[in-house]
From Swiss-Prot:
CDD domains: EngA1, EngA2. GTP 1 binds at residues 9-16, 56-60, 119-122. Residues 359-442 form the KH-like domain. GO terms for molecular function: ATP hydrolysis activity; GTP binding; ribosome binding. Residues 3-169, 183-358 form the EngA-type G domain. PANTHER family: GTPASE DER. The gene is der. Pfam families: KH_dom-like, MMR_HSR1. Belongs to the TRAFAC class TrmE-Era-EngA-EngB-Septin-like GTPase superfamily. EngA (Der) GTPase family. This is GTPase Der.
Length: 459
């Protein structure tokens, strides 16, 4: 998988501003709705031929100075445990603080590659550069002076990050897991929802340590089995190495753990706790599967603790569909990993989704469907002309990806995109992510450029 780069630092040093600047767009909030949110704190980047993923570790709970120090230390510890390179952000205007020194001390002892960034330097004058000088005392090497707000020093920061990445691994940049006949399932979820118990129930043996203490799974655990003549690989996502000083941030970094195994999996099995409603963390993990283009099955565990009443189950299902409507295509199952109830159903559905994940449709059938879609629901008017759909073809699987040739590739309304996606789902019974790419006909851009009136210069 792609290397992970954590952005750490105390509050108000500009971590989120730097994160948005580095990934080139503002993505702190990707869904503005009440209730469950999908705050996204990770994004892919590429520099000098290397792809990697930035993690923004923001989100502190207000408290006194002692609590703040504790939270900053926890943040640094979790970043060291989970990530390959750490960008330690400080505020050059405010100068060194006790929190900065506490984090630096821990990072220095860890031996993890660190880029020390002195933020909020809004120009390159000697006086401003001097403000960053005191941070050399932290013993973390060169200080990268920058201004996240104004975009100064970004190229140098990228260079520093890439220089500290681990050696590139074979298949590191692959967008899809290997197509070798093995179905790869990532068991993801918040701490203490029963991930290890589910794996043990599927394996019918106690191979993974299961405990009521959140964060007892220390590393991703791969387990192989043969199920109905199919080879499966189950990965129980890593929990957090539980240390006495880590108390508050286990949930946040379960996203990082899921990120680590998602890219080498076909299907994400999102485990939830039946005794609790869906929370932000569940939405983040579901959103991660959608954004990474992985098949997703939502499994509500511990159903034995709330009763098997069918009406209650349907009420919970409808609540989930509302909370997680951005993955409305994903099946929702109810199980008890502890008792083994409906565990085989989870594997059956996950196996079906893995096949759909690699589905390929015949081109003639696709184009007959396209004609049918346009006949039933004519394309809208774009820039004063009808939107014309000429041709559709599948260009990739894992997930199914289709290109549609049109006369206005950048003018297709979102509503019509959803219509096409839903028709593809209905026709081919696809309950996995679908990607659509709209493109113009060959030479279309040149023809349109020739049609544009030429501006006349002054005579």
């Amino acid at each position: 998988m792609k290397p992970l780069v954590a952005i750490v630092g105390r509050p108000n040093v500009g971590k989120s501003t730097l994160f948005n600047r580095l990934v080139g767009r503002r993505i702190a909030l990707v869904q503005d709705e009440p209730g469950v949110t999908r705050d996204r704190h990770y994004a892919d980047a590429e520099w000098e031929g290397r792809q990697f993923t930035f993690i923004d570790t923001g989100g502190f709970v207000p408290g006194d100075e002692d609590q703040l120090l504790q939270q900053v230390r926890e943040q640094a510890q979790l970043a060291v445990d989970e990530c390959d390179v750490i960008v330690f952000v400080t505020d050059a205007r405010a100068g060194l603080t006790a929190a900065d020194e506490a984090v630096a001390n821990y990072l220095r002892k860890s031996g993890k590659p660190v880029v020390l960034a002195a933020n909020k330097l809004d120009n390159t004058s000697g006086q401003m550069q001097a403000l960053a000088g005191e941070f050399y005392r932290l013993g973390l090497g060169d200080v990268q002076a920058l201004s996240a707000e104004h975009g100064l020093g970004m190229q140098e920061l990228f260079d520093s990050v890439v220089a500290r990445l681990p050696p590139k691994e074979e298949g590191e940049d692959a967008e899809a897991p290997p197509d070798d006949g093995i179905i790869r399932l990532a068991i993801i979820g918040r701490p203490n929802v029963g991930k290890s118990t589910l794996v043990n129930a599927i394996l019918k043996e106690k191979r993974v340590v299961a405990s009521d203490v959140a964060g007892t799974t220390r590393d991703p655990v791969d387990s192989e089995l043969t199920y109905k003549d199919r080879k499966l690989l189950l990965t129980d996502t890593a929990g957090i190495r539980r240390k006495k000083s880590i108390a508050q941030r286990v949930e946040q970094f379960s996203v990082v753990a899921a990120l680590k195994v998602m890219e080498r999996s076909d299907v994400a099995v999102l485990l939830m706790d039946a005794t609790e409603p869906a929370v932000d963390q569940d939405a983040k993990l579901a959103g991660l599967a959608e954004e990474r283009g992985r098949a997703l099955v939502i499994v509500v565990n511990k159903w034995d603790l709330v009763g098997a009443d069918q009406r209650r189950q349907e009420t919970y299902r409808e609540s989930l569909k509302h909370s997680l409507k951005f993955v409305g295509y994903a099946p929702i199952l109810f199980t008890s990993a502890l008792t083994g109830s409906k565990v085989e159903k989870v594997v059956d559905v996950a196996t079906e989704l893995a096949d759909q994940f690699r589905f390929r449709a015949p081109t003639p059938q696709l184009n007959r469907l396209l004609d049918h879609m346009v006949d039933n629901h004519p394309a809208p008017i774009v820039r004063g002309k009808p939107l014309r759909m000429y041709y559709i073809a599948q260009v990739a699987a894992a997930p199914p990806t289709f290109t549609i040739t049109v006369n206005h590739p950048d003018g297709v309304p979102d509503m019509y995109k959803r219509y096409i996606t839903n028709q593809l789902r209905k026709t081919f019974d696809l309950r996995v992510p679908i990607r659509l790419i709209f493109k113009g006909r060959p030479g279309q851009a040149k023809r349109e450029a020739r049609k544009r009136p030429q501006r006349q210069g002054k005579r």
